[in-house]
């Protein structure tokens, strides 16, 4: 039997206490700052407990649904377009993380905020500047950003034109995006995850 006096209490100094989010879940501001539409912007709310549905937790969207969502957007609720409004409230959110003692904050960068359609030659400076501000705010509190490049979303144009990752044409487009953010944030981000 283990004696309680021998059980270590608390975390070691090198333990990375923190939390995780995804751009498509928290940012909101889906058409602000030059951001283009992403696949997550078309994840309409579906009641997961709707009678007669076996599994309504998926965010799969058919071509017919996408067409309807684009033609009649006011008839549907797209919660990821709002998120928690991190885009406008990141300063107070990061201050709360610091209050909780976070040492690390795992977040993702929205590909559509950096390359609105995924096809642009140059990145969207307004989108890059937003993440500069987020990383600077983290640094202010000594919080280490751990950044995911792709967290279940991409510019909707790439799914419409190439059928997403089903087409290898996406590889150089993703590489362009990855190189842009790796170069831009090389002095602000030490830890990267390619795909969630």
Region locations from a protein language model:
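Substrate-binding cleft and catalytic face of glycoside hydrolase catalytic domains
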Residues: 54-68, 72-73, 92-196
């Amino acid at each position: 039997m283990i004696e309680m006096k021998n059980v270590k209490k608390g975390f070691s100094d090198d333990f990375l206490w923190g939390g995780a989010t995804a751009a498509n879940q928290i940012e909101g501001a889906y058409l602000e700052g030059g951001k283009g539409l992403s696949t997550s912007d078309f994840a309409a709310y579906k009641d997961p407990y709707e009678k007669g549905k076996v599994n309504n937790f998926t965010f799969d969207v058919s071509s017919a649904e996408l067409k309807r969502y684009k033609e009649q957007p006011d008839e549907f609720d797209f919660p990821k377009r709002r998120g928690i409004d991190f885009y406008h409230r990141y300063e107070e959110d990061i201050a709360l993380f610091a209050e909780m003692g976070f040492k690390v904050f795992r977040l993702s960068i929205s590909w559509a905020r950096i390359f609105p359609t995924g096809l642009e030659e140059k990145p969207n400076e307004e989108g890059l500047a937003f993440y500069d501000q987020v990383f600077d705010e983290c640094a202010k509190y000594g919080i280490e950003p751990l950044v995911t490049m792709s967290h279940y979303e991409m510019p909707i144009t790439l799914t419409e034109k190439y059928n997403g990752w089903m087409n290898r044409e996406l590889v150089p487009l993703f590489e362009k995006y990855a190189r842009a953010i790796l170069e831009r944030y090389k002095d602000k981000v030490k830890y990267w995850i390619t795909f969630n």
